[in-house]
Structures are given as structure tokens and as C-alpha cells.
Amino acid sequence: VDRVFLVCGGQKHLMVRVESKNDFDYYAYVMRLDDQKVSYYFEVQTGRITGIFDMRGLVQEVNEYYDFIIIPGFHTPDWAKGAVMYQIYTDRFCNGDSSNDVLTNEYCYIGEPVHRVEDWGRYPAQMDVREFYGGDLQGVLDKMDYLQDLGVEVIYFNPLFVSPSNHKYDIQDYDYIDPHIGKIVSDEGDLLPDGQRENRFASRYIDRVTNKANLEASNELFAQVVAEAHRRGMRVILDGVFNHCGSFNKWMDRERIYENAEGYDKGAYVSADSPYRNYFDFHNQAAWPYNNSYDGWWGHDTLPKLNYEGSQELMDYVLHVAKKWVSPPYNVDGWRLDVAADLGHSQEFNHHFWQEFRKAVKEANPEAIILAEHYGNTRDWLQGNEWDTVMNYDAFMEPVTWFLTGMEKHSDDYREDLLGNAESFWGAMRHHTSSFSMPSWQVAMNELSNHDHSRFLTRTNHKVGRTNTLGPQAAEQGINKAVFREGIVIQMTWTGAPTIYYGDEAGVCGFTDPDNRRTYPWGHEDQVLLAFHKDIIRLRRENEELRIGSLKMLENDYNFISYGRFNRKGQCAILINNNNHPITKEIHVWEIGTPKTGKMKVILQSRDDGYCMEGAEYEIRAGKVLIEMPQTSATILKYVEE
């Protein structure tokens, strides 16, 4: 290389060579930043050849979409960079306190009585939202040793606030943890009699969810959960549902639960004089009392859309909620934001809200993370003044799923043209990762499965369908655990925060929701998969380059990808053979900073018949390693100094 330029704002700045090591020259340029975002790329000149280096790598043409980005003043929490997260759907994780279980006929939800499931191992019903298995926060406390032993660094809870469903994305009261997963100290009243569908007569439920003794005891228990997690070095993220609430919500009160409860104002459904009337958009101003003409999210009357533009008081209150839970005595470490791009009635207001949300949260807890659910281009929200990062569907879950299984993430489609398609894999990764600045990418939530999609292990069977068409047993048939382990290796060696959906590590299967919300199989875990997760998480922790190192694509072929994770302290090469036959590959490891001669050692290899943590050593010759890989295998090689 003759010269290297930093190109920024249309100006070229000559860079200075500051170091040479292992056949690499290192160039630097120091520039003073103001408060404006900086986009840049590098121009590399050698002889008469000029190349452009941007987020795509070395290319011939400039494309500003792939420029590197620096956002002055923007940082994401160091604790979240590369952290191993664990998602808990509380009702299905562990029942530690049967006294708080939802009771059959306690109330009605979507027209039918709720049901307490007595058999922990039963498949979820097709209409699962009103079925309760009894998992709770005491169960999480009881399993803290398990989570710590697994290597979990962050617990992400699906919603925990008062709500009539098991998923709790229809929040009833943002100020309190649901006593059904918290603590019930007052348990007065009766169940609904047979044939009764009106929840204003559900006196047992009303006492459980409106009695301040229950609500405060539940909040206290949650504070204990967070404190215990912190004591063990783990963080906690809450799920925030702020685009909509539930029709049971005390602000709306369509079920008339709060209408006569002590200490509560009338809901907006009940009375035109409700202090919450402007929290919602009502289409018929003459329909009170019991006005059912409110705007629901995507038309769902169980999910009233919150009308922030119509009520500054509502916005102030939700920002108060956002601050409350990341502050003492709860001290939560961040928010995952449900359908965050849908909030408000315009994009302009949406951005305004999240800017104010960020200010509020970071003021209360500067090291709290703000992580949004989003599909599609995230760039507009990741400019340093709104979200920290996103659930990484486009630049992780989807490309990994297509490459390893050929399946769409709901198991709704099979694409043979994408199965094993390394070019498509890297194209998707490059394109979608370009939406991130480095601080956002390092904390992106990288999932293989979650509560909205089929379990990854089920996708390995290539069955297109859902539980209502194929039945739940089909989700377990023809699965390929070796392919699943390939996915785990990618997840645990990719840039970002690998996030395990509870039970994946134990071999739980399931089509898309509700079947993906099966219970954790305590006492019936797949011990090999569980041990594999523990071992690879330990490797990630012991080898810093796997957690926060740079990532570089290496050799690729049909059904084969390889890439490096590296920094000045260590270099690892990750090789994935998704073929059903062995292959031999030559890997140019010098590109990740190894010497031209030396050795690389297998520190993990997964195969059809299991896995091992130690394997052969391979000679580096002229910067390359020649390696034989078994079928359906994943290998991590690490450079070892002699």
C-alpha cells in the first residue's frame, strides 16, 4: 500500500502509518469532532490501483449507505456488549409459588373463562392466551443457581405487569407487577359462577389485582429478584409495552374491574368524565357510558392504542413509568420496547417520543439499555438519541435461519434456494448490519428463537406449518440437533448479545406461537445440548475476541461459511459445514492477524454425534490452515502462541 486516505464530508485526509506487525500496516488519523454524526470510508492506493474500504470490505465504488459511522457522545452500556442474555416467558419457566396461580374460572378473557393447567408438561392449547401454567417470579428466584451455572449475564423478562393474559402484552397496570406471578397476600372473593362472563362479578380476581397489599408485595418480590440477580453479577431487562395497553387497563376499564374498586378513578370506557378520557382516541363522542368506540392497535379491541398526541399527561406518566423501574428500589438495567416503531400516530411524533424516553431513562440510570423490537431498516432510530439497539432479526435471526435450515422464522415457508446459500447469508448480513453504528451492533440482541417465532430446533426439520395444521408432535419430528448446534456456534461467536430463549438450551421444540411457549422441561432436559450451551458460553467468556473482537468474513462455499473474530489479544476462526458430507477447506487465517506460520488449535467442535472441547492442532503454512471437517459440523479454531 502506498497511501491511505480517510474520506469524510467530501474531503480526503492523508493517514499516517503508525505500526507494522505480522505483515499488516496500521494507519491512523486524528480528527476533532463536534456534536454531528460523522460518516466516512477509506481510500487505499497501491500503484495505479485505488480501492474503497467501507462496511462491505474492499470494493471499487463508493456507496454512502455503507459508510462507517461515528455518533459523538453516543455510547451503549459496556456490560451489555457481547453479554449472554436469557429470555424468560415467566408463566412457562418455573412455578415456585402455587398460591398465586391463576384459578380456573377466576375471570374471563376474550369471551371465555381462564384455565389453570395442572399438567406442567402439556402442550399449549391453540387458544393459549387464557391458559396458565403457574410460572412466577419465585420460580425464577428458585432457579437462580441454574441461570448462573448456565452462564447467563442478563435476564430479559417478557412483560411482568398486571395483565389478564399469559403473555402480558395487554397491560392492565404499569405501576405494579402482576400478583399472579408475584405475591398474593389478600385473596378474598369468589370465582365466576358457571355461565357468567362479566368480569365485574369476578370478585376474586378484582381483589387479587386491585388490592394494594398484593400489588405492593409483588413489587417488593420483584425488587428482590433484581437484587439477587445483581448479587450474582447478572442484569435484568424489562419488556415495555407503550404503544398500546389492554382493555382491562385501569385507564380504560372495559371490563369494569376498577369501576367500584377502592382508590381508583373511573376508566375512559366507563365515563366521559374519566381523567383518562384523552388517553385514548374515541370515534363516537356520544356513546358514553361504556363507550366501545376506541381505537385499537391493528383493530384489536383488547389492545387500545394509547393516544399520546391527545394527552401530555399520558406521555408524562409513561415517561415516569420508564424512569420508575430503572430507579431504586427496583434498579432494572433497561427496557426492551414492544412494537416500538408503531407508537404514536405519525413518524414525527414517534421519534419525538423516543427521544424524550431516552432522556428520561438515561437521566434516571445512565447505564440502562434501550432495546427495541423492530423489523426492517433501523437506521432512523439508531442515531444516538433514541434507541440503543434492536432485536436483531434482519442482521442475525433471519440470515442464520435461512442459511442453516432454509426455513422462514415462523416455519411458514421453505426456501431451498436460500438453504446453504453463503452469498445470500453474507449479503444480508452486510446490508442490514450497515444500519448499526459500532456501539449499537455490539449490544444487538441476537436470537435463534423467541416467543413470536418457531423454535430454531423445530426449524431444522423443514416442516412448513403450525400447530393448528400439523399438531404439536410434528414440531419434534425429524429435528437435527447437529444443525441446531451449528446455529448456537454462530450465535455465540457473532458480534452482539447472544440471547437464549428459555428452554432452547434444554431441547424444547415448538412451532410459532402459541406452541413456542411450552414449559421448561425440568428434570427432562437434553443434557448434551445443555452442556454444550454451558461450554460454549464459558469459551465466549474466556476468549475476549469472541465477545468484543472484530469480525471478518473468510472462505465461503455452498453450505459452508467461515469468519474470524479477533483483536490484539487473540484470534479465532469459526467454520460451519452445513453439508451432509465431510469437506476439506483451506482457510486464510493470516487475514485475522495470525502469523504466517504457527499453530491453530480446535477449542470446540460440534458433530453429528455430539461435540468435543479439545481437538487437533493445525499448522499455519503461508498464513493458511488446511482442515478436514465432518458433516454437519461447527469448529472454532484459536491461534496458540508457541
Named regions from a protein language model:
Residues 82-83, 150-155, 230-237, 330-335, ...:
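Loop/turn elements at helix/coil->beta-strand transitions in domains of secreted/extracellular proteins
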Residues 1-89, 95, 101-103, 125, ...:
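Carbohydrate-interacting/catalytic domains
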Residues 31-35, 46, 89-94, 161, ...:
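Short, flexible loop/turn elements at secondary-structure junctions
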Residues 304-312, 339-358:
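Active-site cleft segment of glycoside hydrolase catalytic domains centered on the general acid/base Glu
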Residues 90-92, 155-167, 238-249, 338-343, ...:
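Short, solvent-exposed turn/loop segments enriched in Gly/Ser/Thr/Pro and often Arg
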